Amino acid sequence: MIKFALALTLCLAGASLSLAQHNPRWWGNRNTIVHLFEWKWSDIAEECETFLAPRGFAGVQVSPVNENIISAGRPWWERYQPISYKLTTRSGNEEEFADMVRRCNDVGIRIYVDVLLNHMSGDFDGVAVGTAGTEAEPSKKSFPGVPYTAQDFHPSCEITDWNNRFQVQECELVGLKDLNQHSDYVRSKLIEFLDHLIELGVAGFRVDAAKHMAAVDLEYIYGSLSNLNIEHGFPHNARPFIFQEVIDHGHETVSREEYNELGAVTEFRFSEEIGKAFRGNNALKWLQSWGTDWGFLNSDQALTFVDNHDNQRDQGSVLNYKSPRQYKMATAFHLAYPYGISRVMSSFAFDDHDTPPPQDAQENIISPEFDEDGACVNGWICEHRWRQIYAMVGFKNAVRDTELSGWWDNGDNQISFCRGNKGFLAVNNNLYDLSQELNTCLPAGEYCDVISGSLVDGACTGKSVTVNEHGYGYIHIGSDDFDGVLALHVNAKV
């Protein structure tokens, strides 16, 4: 009986830790993450203070923080080829990173680090030099900056069969030297690295290439991490938020279900399907059942996004900033519909898959610059600064914890729905106007459309909608309007 009780206690403790790792540790009613891809730490700190916090963002996913290989031309993907766990990259050094984390936490913005636990750098001709000046010989699996030697890696082999579990989890992903996470020594170095970031005040981690590591090894690593640092405003015994990159199209041996109990999982099917819908390849009327009915993970297990730094560069259904009208409609739907843990993308312009972030002649990443409307210039796209997107972050905050209700569609590509009695969204993806009296579910009054403008000094700078005592209002979205979406919420009532 004593043995049974002990086993039950350990089982419950493990379940409790796993559930805790699904909690993003947001501040207040905020509930949207932004990925500031390849931004410098000093610029993120300022963005937290001057833009993200005032507009209600919840957190920032940052690019990998550890030393990486220096590749010719400085492609973005060099950040995903570790040389050591020293916190020096083109985004800044450890002191600058720590300052950024502190300043963002001070204004209620949580930091989530993209971490590389699966591998080190791939082959390099001769001695490679990292962004902190550390030398390594990847072809010999020699990384003195950690240190790792060949015995800390799986034997070299290629992934040729994605239905072969051994190949997927023990061979080299695109030639990257594959760490043996079952080794006590490797585990200790990874835990030490993550714990140092926790000590500096981060709230959690995006785990790159999680499907290429055995779930049992990740479970051990996650379970061995320290609690979040209470000096940065986290409650006692709070666990780091974990969200794992698991690309699962539903037909491979390694599945997302192996990982979703350990933490959230990146729901790539969400990205693909929302792209198909707003590109016109699937009628919007079908989105009424959006979520688990589409084969997605449970809402609290799914990290959701329209695009990410990888798939925005691929050909296919995924939307990106280059289709701005459809992208803004898809993002509005994403942030208005009650499903998933939402993340929005903040990109830099690219012409090909390898385009580096904006940089000067000395290959230093340059800071974003802004025009008079606050939009980014000089090579940065900054979708999070588009009014139509940051306004929907405010919408999502305003309607938090409300249910979907009042669904309407025209049988095709015009839809609307309510979020309780706090918010209303309408979308027109048809080639003709939407002009209709619709139930907004809102209290009577005049509301500003936060897509076309905002509430300033008691007046709307864009469209407005008058809602009658029955909750109905006249909604017009022209087929040639600049934006194909309209959004109202109680915090934008005149």
Swiss-Prot record:
It holds the Pfam family Alpha-amylase. The record marks 310 as: Transition state stabilizer. It is an enzyme of class 3 (hydrolase). The keyword Metal-binding applies. One of its GO terms (biological process) is carbohydrate metabolic process. InterPro entries: A-amylase/branching_C, A-amylase_C, Alpha_amylase, Glyco_hydro_13_cat_dom, Glyco_hydro_b, Glycoside_hydrolase_SF. CDD domains: AmyAc_bac_euk_AmyA. Ca(2+) binds at residues 118, 169, 178, 212. It comes from the Eukaryota. GO terms for molecular function: alpha-amylase activity; metal ion binding. It is found in: Secreted. Its EC number is 3.2.1.1. Its cofactor is Ca(2+); chloride. This is Alpha-amylase-related protein. It comes from Drosophila bakoue (Fruit fly). The gene is Amyrel.
